[in-house]
């Protein structure tokens, strides 16, 4: 996971790196790159000094086994190589191809880096050959472990790509099948429905012609023997109709109305009892559901009100218990802070005496210089103006450091009285 400290190490943004913790400086991104590796890759010496002084691991590698020395040697950053060698980085570290930083510099034809690493290797071989053999064995062991880790990551990535590729293939095949089936269905349905509609239209035309011919013939035959309409009924003959005929006529009209209203249920061959029974059952179900709702609603409302009342009673009891605890522990309320809100920094790194001394005198920017020369607080108190001049410190910083040393010596010689301070 890439963080802002990775970007600060790449861009040599020193103010942000001074706030980083040991965990932040050793956190790897997707490629296994840490801020230490990025600072060595880009040749940012000041950023590399701050990172290593705040706990950055100079021997941590990426997924390909490259350490900060590998990147500095490959890109020709001699100043970073000299700092890492003096800081104690393993110059015999191996990558996944079992190549050391010296081999990486030789493959890129970085002659100065090759000479610097060769000189450091000869010095370590002459001074402590047992330590050199132990470092080489450890480097080989770490390289084999890193190779297995890299193979596992590659296998996982290949399986993931294969799954995504198979999903894409299945999606394209299904889409092609669906398009083919749709086109086939559309063509067949269009042909069938077109022929059917054409046949239906032809039959309707033929029937309409026949109906017209028959109606015309019937009208002609009927009109030949009919009387005019005005001659059929007269006002004088209206009262002469018998009452039985009128009652029959009225009854026939009512029957026609009943037939028209009951035509939905009275179907020939289906049965009117089935439909009417279903209608009756539907009404009964609706009435039963209404009754159930009518019985359920009040009980649910009473339950909710009771639950709300119980919740309020529980809250009041909890508040009373808290007040009793506060009264019993009277000292807890006297504290000016809340102990639960106090947050402790988990990743805080224990500062060295030299770092504490420089921080107290506002001289923390000179810490990388002393770390590079392996100077601790005791050695710094023994340094003179000439010693500081030999490590290439300028006049202004030398005067500040010397005055701070004098103040410390005076305080140690004449310590003051211990006095309690108020919070």
Swiss-Prot record:
Q: What residue stretches are annotated with the SAM domain?
A: 357-409
Keyword Coiled coil on entry: yes
GO terms of biological process kind: brush border assembly; cell differentiation; protein localization to microvillus; protein-containing complex assembly; response to endoplasmic reticulum stress
Q: Which domain of life is it from?
A: Eukaryota
Instruction: Name it.
Output: Ankyrin repeat and SAM domain-containing protein 4B
Write down the InterPro entries for this protein, in alphabetical order. Answer: ANKS4B_SAM (IPR037601), Ankyrin_rpt (IPR002110), Ankyrin_rpt-contain_sf (IPR036770), SAM (IPR001660), SAM/pointed_sf (IPR013761)
The gene coding this protein: Anks4b
Mostly located where?
other
- UniProt biased composition (Acidic residues): 311-324
- Where are the residues of the annotated region Disordered? 158-181, 207-227, 303-335
């Amino acid at each position: 996971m890439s963080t802002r400290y990775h970007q600060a190490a790449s861009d040599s943004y020193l103010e942000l790196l001074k706030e980083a913790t040991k965990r932040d400086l050793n956190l790897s991104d997707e490629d296994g790159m840490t801020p230490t590796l990025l600072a060595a890759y880009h040749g940012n010496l000041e950023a590399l000094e701050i990172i290593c002084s705040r706990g950055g691991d100079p021997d941590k590698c990426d997924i390909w086994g490259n350490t900060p020395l590998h990147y500095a040697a490959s890109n020709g950053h001699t100043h970073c190589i000299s700092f890492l060698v003096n800081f104690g980085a393993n110059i015999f570290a191996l990558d996944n191809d079992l190549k050391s930083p010296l081999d990486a510099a030789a493959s890129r034809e970085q002659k100065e880096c090759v000479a610097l690493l060769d000189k450091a290797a000869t010095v370590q071989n002459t001074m402590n050959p047992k330590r050199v053999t132990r470092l080489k064995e450890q480097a080989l062991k770490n390289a084999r472990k890193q190779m297995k880790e890299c193979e596992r990551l590659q296998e996982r990535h290949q399986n993931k790509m294969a799954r995504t590729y198979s999903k894409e293939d299945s999606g394209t095949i299904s889409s092609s099948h669906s398009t083919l089936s749709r086109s086939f269905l559309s063509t067949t349905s269009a042909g069938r429905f077109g022929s059917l509609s054409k046949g239906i239209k032809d039959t309707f035309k033929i029937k309409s012609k026949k109906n017209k011919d028959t109606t015309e013939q019937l009208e002609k035959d009927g009109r030949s023997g009919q009387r005019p309409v005005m001659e059929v009924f007269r006002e004088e003959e209206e009262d002469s109709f018998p009452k039985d005929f009128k009652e029959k006529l009225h009854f026939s009209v009512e029957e026609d109305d009943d037939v028209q209203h009951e035509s939905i249920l009275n179907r020939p061959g289906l049965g009117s009892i089935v439909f009417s029974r279903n209608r009756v059952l539907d009404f009964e179900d609706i009435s039963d559901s209404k009754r159930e709702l009518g019985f359920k609603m009040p009980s649910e409302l009473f339950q909710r009100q009771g639950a709300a009342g119980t919740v309020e009673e529980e809250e009041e009891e909890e508040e009373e218990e808290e007040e009793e605890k506060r009264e019993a522990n009277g000292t807890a309320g006297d504290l000016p802070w809340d102990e639960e809100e106090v947050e402790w920094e988990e990743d805080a790194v224990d500062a060295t005496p030299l770092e504490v001394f420089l921080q107290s005198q506002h001289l923390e920017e000179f810490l990388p210089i002393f770390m590079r020369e392996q100077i601790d607080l005791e050695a710094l108190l023994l340094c003179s103006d000439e010693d500081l001049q030999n490590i290439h410190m300028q006049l202004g910083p030398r005067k500040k450091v010397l005055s701070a040393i004098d103040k410390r010596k005076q305080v140690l010689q004449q310590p003051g009285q211990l006095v309690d301070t108020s919070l």
